[in-house]
């Protein structure tokens, strides 16, 4: 099996190694546009010899903004701003894909000025906020909104695009029977619950052409007692491959607890079993994310064929040049302790390690 520092091909894109910087909201955008702080952040990541950098989630619609500091991709006006981020990474020798993230039922009215939307009308379990059910026509429009956002991403010069379909955001909520209680073509069976995501991927492929890498961060199973099992998530991954998706980043879907996917006490990578199942089911590249800190764990995951690449985020918040330190054996592990202090700083419009 190829090692951590072997090249990886995703569609026509070749990245120099199998380390991925996974996306996270950074809270630093200014009115949806790239800030100077973000240019500096991504410029430093671009110098770090990371195989592929995935940006924080770009909102495909104004109503889908998940945080006040989120980047936008719902207007052509955003293209020159996004290009500054891309240029900063490319000047350092890196490659960058843009993630698209619609907050859906996780959005807050104080950010969007609107009632949050989702697959079904219900109350949000934490905030108590009433969620408005999207109509069929609105879903069709959202498919086009995602495709237009991906077109802007390509025009800004990004090397690829990733859809966020995990962590309870809009696409993830459609995949879960807990939040999707519809009885039409967009809900019910597992296949129908996947229709929104699949049609979005197909629409994006038509917009982007055959050679532009399309990736999906996919919640393979829900960490909720009434949620979807991993078997459904694996089948969704199969369908996405058939629809022209080029890579899957394995994560979790609906969360009973927001901090479930950022666990301080984990002693091993979180999603090994789910990733192994997906890797056995599809032929496109699979990324494993979640709690990976040690070089020997990374090498084990690759050597055993569990995944094709290793995704990390908090480690790069603390050490943007971690890849070079691992390559030269100056360290055997990230220094990150998963204290999650970076989350507190993010809420204040700054993405940084709280203990460095």
Regions found by a protein language model. Name each.
Residues 1-356:
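Flavin-dependent oxidoreductase catalytic cores
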């Amino acid at each position: 099996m190829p090692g951590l520092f072997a090249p990886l091909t995703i569609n026509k894109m070749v990245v120099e190694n199998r380390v991925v910087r996974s996306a996270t909201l950074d809270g630093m955008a200014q009115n949806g546009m790239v800030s100077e702080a973000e240019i500096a952040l991504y410029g430093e990541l671009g110098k770090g010899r990371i195989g592929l950098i995935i940006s924080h989630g770009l909102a495909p619609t104004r109503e889908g903004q998940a945080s006040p500091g989120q980047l936008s991709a719902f207007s052509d006006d955003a293209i020159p701003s996004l290009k500054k981020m891309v240029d900063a990474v490319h000047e350092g020798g890196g490659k960058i894909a843009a993630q698209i993230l619609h907050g859906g039922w996780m959005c807050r009215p104080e950010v969007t000025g609107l009632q949050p939307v989702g697959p079904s009308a219900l109350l949000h379990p934490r905030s108590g906020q009433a969620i408005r059910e999207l109509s069929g026509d609105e879903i069709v429009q959202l498919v086009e909104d995602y495709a237009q956002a991906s077109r802007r991403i390509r025009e800004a010069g990004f090397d690829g695009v990733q859809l966020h379909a995990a962590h309870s955001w809009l696409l993830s909520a459609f995949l879960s029977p807990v939040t999707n209680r519809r009885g039409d073509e967009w809900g019910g069976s597992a296949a129908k619950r996947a229709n929104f995501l699949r049609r979005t991927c197909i629409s994006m492929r038509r917009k982007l052409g055959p050679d532009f890498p399309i990736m999906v961060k996919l919640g393979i199973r829900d960490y909720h007692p009434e949620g979807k099992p991993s078997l459904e998530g694996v089948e969704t991954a199969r369908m996405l491959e058939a629809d022209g998706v080029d890579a899957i980043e394995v994560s979790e879907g609906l969360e009973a607890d927001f901090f479930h996917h950022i666990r301080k006490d984990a002693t091993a990578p979180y999603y090994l079993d789910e990733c192994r199942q997906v890797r056995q089911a599809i032929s496109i590249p699979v990324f494993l994310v979640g709690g990976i800190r040690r070089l020997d764990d990374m090498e084990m995951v690759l050597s055993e064929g569990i995944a094709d690449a290793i995704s990390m985020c908090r480690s790069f918040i603390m050490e943007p040049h971690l890849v070079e330190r691992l390559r030269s054996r100056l360290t055997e592990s990230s220094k990150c302790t998963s204290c999650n202090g970076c989350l507190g700083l993010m809420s204040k419009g700054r993405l940084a390690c709280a203990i460095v």
